Amino acid sequence: MATEGALSSTGYMLHHLTHNASGKMQSIIDFSVINYDTIFFSILMLVVSLWLLRRAAKNATSGVPGKFQCAVEMLVDMVEEQSKSIVHGDRTFIAPCALTVFVWVVLMNAIDLIPVDLLPAIAGLFGIHYLRPLPTADLNGTMGISIAVLLLSLYYGFKIKGAGGWFHELFSAPFGNHFLLWPFNCALNIIEYLAKTV
């Protein structure tokens, strides 16, 4: 602890911007480096979000809901309306997955409410010198989540609409089915897919 007090402001910032990682990152996004703190806190917040949603479902009553049940029901209604406007088929997997990802990301961002020095100081007691507890501050983590959501949306787009329906929508929406409009429709739909997920 005495050596931490001797850090300059630049050293302090560099210490707090360094992940507990398997190696040194060569670029801002480097998938060959594993950031252990990002993985640990992401999985921890996923378990907490699943536990919270399970607890809300288990304790739900048909009578007057409590504050927690009301908040979860509002989230469920919001996600259901969003999924209804986007997916016009079977939403039995998509809506719960979207709810889980939403709560998970909110909880990962909520870690930022914990004082910045508290968790690294606790980890330092156990010999962990670098700890960056906010998973969404790691571009590898956020890119991983967005790529997974993009792949899920493409998969379920194919599954619900079929290959023919998906490609027809890719080239004919929103400007029409004329062959001169196909490049514009395709470009706009690709931008839309990337904007929704990445």
For every predicted segment, state its role.
Residues 1-198:
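Selective transmembrane helix interface/packing segments
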